[in-house]
Amino acid sequence: MNYLFKDGRYMNEEGKIVATDLLVQDGKIAKVAENITADNAEVIDVNGKLIAPGLVDVHVHLREPGGEHKETIETGTLAAAKGGFTTICAMPNTRPVPDCREHMEDLQNRIKEKAHVNVLPYGAITVRQAGSEMTDFETLKELGAFAFTDDGVGVQDASMMLAAMKRAAKLNMAVVAHCEENTLINKGCVHEGKFSEKHGLNGIPSVCESVHIARDILLAEAADCHYHVCHVSTKGSVRVIRDAKRAGIKVTAEVTPHHLVLCEDDIPSADPNFKMNPPLRGKEDHAALIEGLLDGTIDMIATDHAPHTAEEKAQGIERAPFGITGFETAFPLLYTNLVKKGIITLEQLIQFLTEKPADTFGLEAGRLKEGRTADITIIDLEQEEEIDPTTFLSKGKNTPFAGWKCQGWPVMTIVGGKIAWQKESALV
């Protein structure tokens, strides 16, 4: 099916939002211009809505295989499509871990069979993510590994991390890291700060993250490796990454929507839906994340979509697993709380969710260019809705944002020229 989207707006190559039509033919973007006509295409009047590149998320947890009670490739990718994401990168903390040919082939077959959006799987750095034996990077790359990470745990052994970075560098691949120094975690369930003190909870100190990042940055410099830092959350981490970039070290970084919108002061009670790792930090950390995003220290936004069951989250803040679901709330949360408040521009938000992650990892995604695969998201910037977890397509309903009123909701998502999801009656 060919589609002609009429009367839309998009961000052009100069970074300006302008009026446009867009023609999709044979799964590709055939033309982006005003006043397009086509005889062999279904016309969809978007009535002034935003035509954006399909969103790109380099940090997601789909749980399959092994955690299908939390999420599946099918439910997770449907949720991604509803959130406007057309390319997502799946972390390897599944069971089994994609750490060898057999496991990666099985995962890729599942993706091919079930996924509603483009899914790029990470390969594990170490066997079973146990930190003691390196995986076969060459084989995992051959089978389509996006990059290498043990996300969910930090690689504690410096010699292992250095060896991994050297091998990844030879393959022109990135090492991606969840950064925690295990000796400083302190069995914490929240940030070590005012909230932990008030509620008598063990806290995770900020330095637990930043000291690990500092170590890895020096290792990346020694290995001449592209090193990407997951979900930055502290002022110290931002400072270390900024200094590394100024020194010419190949480091990039991401931040989550929840760390841009919330800090520990926003946690109303010991609610496990506010429990994520890294935890919500202090006000100064929150301000540093915004500053880092604006000055280029932090390169992109990634959701860290981490679904869990209601039963798991009901165990209380100390025992419940870390993580919140993120696909279906990301854009409206960021648009409402950053763009509408004048903190960043709409153009910047689009870049942080599309071309920045795509360019960082060399993906042919993130831009509406003629000849490229038609991965497109239509967004109604005027539509206001209340976040209602019962409507999520994800199995995970675990969100701290229930009841928040937000503007800027995706209404249609196109993947490879085909409609992957659309809001009923939104485009008529």
From Swiss-Prot:
Zn(2+) 2 binds at residues 151, 178, 231. It comes from the Bacteria. Keywords: Hydrolase, Metal-binding, Pyrimidine biosynthesis, Zinc. The keyword Nucleotidyltransferase does not apply. It catalyses: (S)-dihydroorotate + H2O = N-carbamoyl-L-aspartate + H(+). Gene3D superfamilies: Metal-dependent hydrolases, Urease, subunit C, domain 1. GO terms for biological process: 'de novo' UMP biosynthetic process; purine nucleobase catabolic process. Zn(2+) 1 binds at residues 59, 61, 151, 304. Substrate binds at residues 61-63, 93, 277, 308, 322-323. One of its GO terms (cellular component) is cytoplasm. One of its GO terms (molecular function) is allantoinase activity. Pathway: Pyrimidine metabolism; UMP biosynthesis via de novo pathway; (S)-dihydroorotate from bicarbonate: step 3/3. Its cofactor is Zn(2+). Binds 2 Zn(2+) ions per subunit. PANTHER family: ALLANTOINASE. Belongs to the metallo-dependent hydrolases superfamily. DHOase family. Class I DHOase subfamily. Catalyzes the reversible cyclization of carbamoyl aspartate to dihydroorotate. NCBIfam families: PRK09357.1-2, pyrC_multi. This is Dihydroorotase.
